[in-house]
């Protein structure tokens, strides 16, 4: 229930709340949170929104501006399949001037220029260059097609295992509330025993 989830966030807001952090897709159970609903409520109260898209970016078809977040960080090595250590920072244009990198940006950098965050020192240029190839590959497949395939695979295995009465799925089966990841348990088994058996 999107309204109930949103209420859990809004009930924790106070007059002192300046920023809310929302995990778009929870990594351990695969549940998708109603990020835009929560963000809309936060904005009504003057609260900035940070959206963690580490497990949603490149997985399903959405656009960051449509979530109404002010800031977002993501790992590009997950569902976008870029190299390890690559990531992306998104800051809404009108918020850029309010944030500065921990390492000093060049003096020539304007305060409202997102490139002020690119002063990273020594880094892997090979990894950076490979991001473009990963984006190209993702675009060849297509976001919607990729999402449909991943949903099919998750639904396939969850439907198979739930035929066993000892198996329980703890992730929503509603496509609006989950995508690729699902959490399961087996009666009489500890989570670490399931992990050891499967992996």
Model-derived features with residue positions:
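Pyridoxal 5′-phosphate
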Residues: 1-199
């Amino acid at each position: 229930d999107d309204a109930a989830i949103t209420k859990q966030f809004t009930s924790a807001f106070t007059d002192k709340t300046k920023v809310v952090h929302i995990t778009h897709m929870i990594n351990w159970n695969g549940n998708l949170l109603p990020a835009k609903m929560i963000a809309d409520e936060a904005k009504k109260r003057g609260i900035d929104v940070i959206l963690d898209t580490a497990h949603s970016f490149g997985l399903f078809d959405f656009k960051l501006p449509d979530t109404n977040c002010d800031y977002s960080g993501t790992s590009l090595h997950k569902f976008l399949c870029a190299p390890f250590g690559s990531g992306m920072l998104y800051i809404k244009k009108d918020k850029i001037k309010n944030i500065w990198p921990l390492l000093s940006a060049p003096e020539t950098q304007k305060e409202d220029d997102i490139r002020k965050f690119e002063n990273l020192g020594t880094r892997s240029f090979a990894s950076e260059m490979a991001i473009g190839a990963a984006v190209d590959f993702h675009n060849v497949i297509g976001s919607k097609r990729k999402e449909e395939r991943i949903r099919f695979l998750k639904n396939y295995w969850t439907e198979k295992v739930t035929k066993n009465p000892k198996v329980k799925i703890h992730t929503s089966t509603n496509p609006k509330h989950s995508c690729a990841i699902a959490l399961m348990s087996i009666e009489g088994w500890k989570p670490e025993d399931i992990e050891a058996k499967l992996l």
